[in-house]
């Protein structure tokens, strides 16, 4: 099969979740004999035309001077144009929809017959509170257009799958994100942050309102753990919401904003040795950092929503508000005694059985073959 990954910011990954996904899946598919191309913006530091057998197609992107939002529309448009007009792909995998819809309409993707265009719908983007009212309306329109113009949809979370079925009557294929079990934790990484094993809490997220950082912080501050074990907040603080959080909570003795941590071993070690891990993401789908926390054997306390429950199932305790966070922390020793081993063991098994990258390569290969069978038997 000839397969393309479009609307990713290149591989090897130096950007985010879709890029890590594209790297693992594309390399895995190449090892199985498929011809895979990943589109990459011109500003990506990796300039070779091949990576571990994957063809890299470099496309000019003005994002560095035009800005990420506007520039990404241009980059995605030119990438899809190349994939449709100059190549002969069997499958074009579209990673998200928020900057590709004008290209979908321009190229009349729904009537394309040469290639099968399948779109990963990501989360409920129009619910992201970082967008103002008008942007959310535009993104909601984009969602409808993605459903209309894509040949097939992919959902990385069963909550997302159910949403599209109920709202649009459209089926989507559940194909999750992945993670690998970690086994090289290094307690020495704690020293850099003045931490001790199981004597701190951790939250890892983009500092955006929909990730409910305020809920976790307020719950912590009103608990008996405030000042006893610090709450470590990992994430860039240069977002508007991040700046608000630092201004409001930065002087609290128990709350520490440490910025982003991009050394994977360091981050997973700090996750692993925590007393508990807060996961507040609430707009879906399957968040990569949640899978990484599961793979790192974290004791996870999660915001109560359908997306987190779809992944964690019975291997977490859930909080709908700050008061519940306070209640949990006030009883943390009993909670850990009752649940920690069962929850962490259960999450590790879930990663092995459902979210390992090798398993996901199997699933994607099988699904892409099925798509071609549908095409040739129509």
Q: Regions from the language model: what does each represent?
A:
Residues 4, 194-222, 232:
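Conserved donor-binding/catalytic core segment of Leloir-type glycosyltransferases
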Residues 269-285, 298:
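Acidic donor-binding loop of glycosyltransferase active sites
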Residues 81, 135-153:
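Membrane-proximal helix-turn-helix segments that form the acceptor-binding/catalytic region
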Residues 8-14, 28-67, 159-165, 236-240:
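N-terminal strand-loop element at the rim of the active site
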Residues 295, 299-302:
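Short hydrophobic beta-strand element within catalytic cores of glycosyltransferases
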């Amino acid at each position: 099969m000839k397969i393309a990954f479009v609307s990713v910011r290149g591989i090897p990954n130096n950007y985010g979740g879709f890029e890590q996904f594209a790297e693992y899946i594309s390399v895995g598919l190449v090892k199985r004999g498929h011809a895979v191309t990943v589109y990459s913006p011109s500003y990506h530091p990796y300039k070779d035309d091949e990576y571990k057998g994957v063809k890299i197609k470099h496309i000019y992107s003005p994002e560095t001077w035009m800005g990420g939002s506007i520039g990404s529309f241009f980059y995605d448009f030119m990438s899809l144009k190349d994939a449709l007009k100059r190549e002969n792909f069997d499958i074009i995998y579209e990673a998200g929809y928020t900057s590709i819809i004008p290209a979908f309409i321009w190229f009349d993707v729904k009537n394309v017959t040469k290639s099968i265009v399948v779109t990963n719908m990501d989360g409920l983007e129009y619910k992201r509170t970082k967008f103002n009212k008008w942007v959310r309306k535009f993104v909601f329109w984009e969602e409808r257009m993605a459903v209309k113009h894509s040949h097939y949809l992919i959902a990385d979370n069963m909550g997302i799958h159910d949403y599209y079925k109920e709202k649009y009557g459209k089926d989507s294929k559940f194909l999750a994100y992945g993670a690998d079990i970690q086994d090289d934790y290094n307690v020495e990484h704690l020293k850099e942050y003045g931490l001790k094993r199981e004597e701190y809490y951790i939250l890892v997220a983009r500092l955006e309102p929909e990730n409910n950082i305020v809920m976790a912080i307020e719950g912590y501050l009103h608990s008996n753990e405030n000042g006893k074990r610090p709450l470590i907040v990992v994430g860039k603080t240069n977002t508007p919401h991040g700046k608000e959080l630092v201004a409001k909570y930065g002087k609290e003795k128990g709350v520490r904003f440490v910025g982003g941590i991009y050394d994977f071993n360091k981050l997973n070690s700090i996750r692993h040795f925590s007393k508990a891990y807060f996961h507040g993401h609430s707009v879906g789908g399957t968040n990569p950092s949640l899978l990484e926390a599961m793979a790192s054997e974290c004791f996870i306390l999660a915001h109560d929503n359908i997306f987190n429950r779809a992944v964690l199932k019975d291997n977490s305790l859930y909080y709908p508000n700050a008061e519940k966070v306070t209640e949990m922390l006030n009883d943390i020793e009993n909670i850990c005694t009752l649940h920690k081993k069962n929850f962490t063991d259960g999450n590790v098994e879930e990663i092995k059985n459902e979210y390992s990258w090798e398993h996901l390569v199997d699933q994607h290969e099988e699904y892409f073959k099925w798509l071609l069978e549908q095409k040739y038997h129509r």
